Amino acid sequence: MYESISVYHVDFSASSLFVSKFGVIRTFFFLPDNEVNAMSRSHPLQSQLFPPYAAALCGGAGLLLLLLALCRTAGLSDAPSRLPVGLCLVLLCALAAGLLFYEDRRPGAALFALLPIGLALFLRALCLEHVTYDYRDFLSGWASFFRENGGWAAVALPKGNYNVPYLYFLAAISYLPVRDLYLIKLFSMLFDVLLAWGGYRLVRRLSVPGSYCPCTAFCILLLLPTVVLNGAYWAQCDSIYGALCLHALASALDRRPAGSVVLLALAFSFKLQTVFLVPLWGALWFAGRVRFRDLLLFPATYVLTIVPALFLGKPLGDILGVYFGQAAEYSDYLTLNAPSLYALIPYGAEVDTTLAARLGILAAFLFTVSILLWLLLRRGRLTDRALFTAGAAFAVGIPLLLPHMHDRYFFLADTITLCWACLDRRRGIPAAILVQVASLG
């Protein structure tokens, strides 16, 4: 006897993501290498600095927005948290501007970027007080549990369904006299900045020298709706694994294979959804970009992330069972507000859940194998752009086909397609818009 379930609603944003997915595949499979390599040249090379007066105006406007953000923190409901949160916003602004100047070395670009940086922090300051059901029912209880059970000592106890690196964070903040809601959101906001930095590095690798495409990616990633909402509004932590994945991909294309594998393993230690991008390292291996001994750093790094928990007394079975528990938690639902193909099933339709899920898993497997096979056949002449496009196809296509997906599982697809849009306006912008609309839908 098969299980059956009534599909509760139809999310037609899945159709837009379906179109976007095949736009990515078309770029990868059907464009010749010379055109693929020339995609970023749709942006003219900009050799002149920004006009000084315009840069000064943008810098001043950005600082004004930062001041407004600080005014917002001065009115937070938890009075002891106001000053620490305000200082954290200032530090985040300094970090974002400093990273951009470190990478770009053009003062005009850094001054111009203060405007989107200030706006990004202002929008996040407006979101700090918002409490979601997920935070109220789960994260709040976990944070309180760590405060009440000895902080680091509580890591050994069976609380929370996140992997141990995030539990280390919850243990660390349990000693701080700041409201947990703000600390959790600020931690994600820190990785929002690191995510933008990863986008900068990735786009810089694929764009022509002197282009402002990397700066554009940095600024837009900070303002991307799903990035702003994920951490500052929903108190989620997808920017952590997203940032690490972008840096891993950038490092791989920069011919830093060992570092890329370590970053990928760190991303996996935070979020299981990193597996959407993992197949790309198989392509990097048979293309000679990554050695087998480099791949061994993945399990080694993961083991290092769980060693502190083992020393604190947490059973190995509890650690290794986290991701299996997450996978089983939503096994009764074909989709949880995710813009996957299952969202196209009409409202009220009776569906054989087991069969539909197996077909989706098979489709995702065949999709992944087909791209890897194509890359294998072209391994002697793979370009950075071809590898990047394959990564984008994995990030969009795998969660599109898999069952049991949550809407936030497209976070990586949102960020990678945004980087693509900064590189190629004609093809990338429509894909990025479709993916973003689907994620928010």
Language-model-detected regions and their locations in the chain:
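Aromatic/glycine/proline-enriched transmembrane-helix motif characteristic
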Residues: 99-105, 109, 205, 327-401
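Membrane-embedded helix bundles of polyisoprenyl
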Residues: 120, 213-250, 260-273, 298, ...
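Extracytoplasmic catalytic/substrate-binding loops of multi-pass membrane glycan-assembly enzymes
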Residues: 128-142, 157-169, 331-341
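Loop-to-helix entry region of an early transmembrane alpha helix in multi-pass inner-membrane enzymes
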Residues: 164, 168, 178-197, 353-363
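Transmembrane-helix motifs of polytopic, lipid-linked glycan transferases
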Residues: 186-208, 367-377
